[in-house]
Amino acid sequence: MGSITEEQERGLIDAVEVGAGLAGWHGGMADSFRESINYQFMVGGQWVAHPGNIIEYEVNVVDHEDPVTAGLEDFRMRSEQYYMHVDPSNKVLATTTFSGEHVPWIEGNVIPVVWKRKWGKGRVFYSSLGHVAKDFEVPGARTLVERGMLWASK
């Protein structure tokens, strides 16, 4: 979506490595700098597609013990369901399963929706939810981002 200079990239990555938190959602974080592999490694993933554009889908909370997800149950969204390339070292907190209705070869694929990770001494939180502000009227989506940002800031 955008570009980042080597100097800017190094500054951001260095800041997180020494303890700064980084949190974000949707394409603003996972499709910011397609040409920056180092940024993608730090974030833990890269957007690929949203088959069907705005559709109904389910978000499945997979870790009910984590402070970011404690007390949350699965919930429905009507938004872009992100298909992503994701780092297997992420601590996945929520996933979604693709129906295959819009792209048959991804039927049954489970893709992380929300994750967190350490990057050096820093913390990184990401949620693919949040294409438009209205998406955060869904309590589960809003709570995940609120708690995730707080976790990353510690």
Question: Where is each model-derived feature located?
Answer:
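Short amphipathic alpha-helical segments and helix-helix/interface helices
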Residues: 9-13, 83, 149
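Active-site-proximal beta-strand/loop segments in catalytic clefts of secreted hydrolases
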Residues: 1, 25-29, 95-98, 127-131
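Short alpha-beta junction capping motif
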Residues: 1-33, 121
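Catalytic beta-strand/loop cores that center a nucleophilic Ser/Cys/Thr
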Residues: 45-120
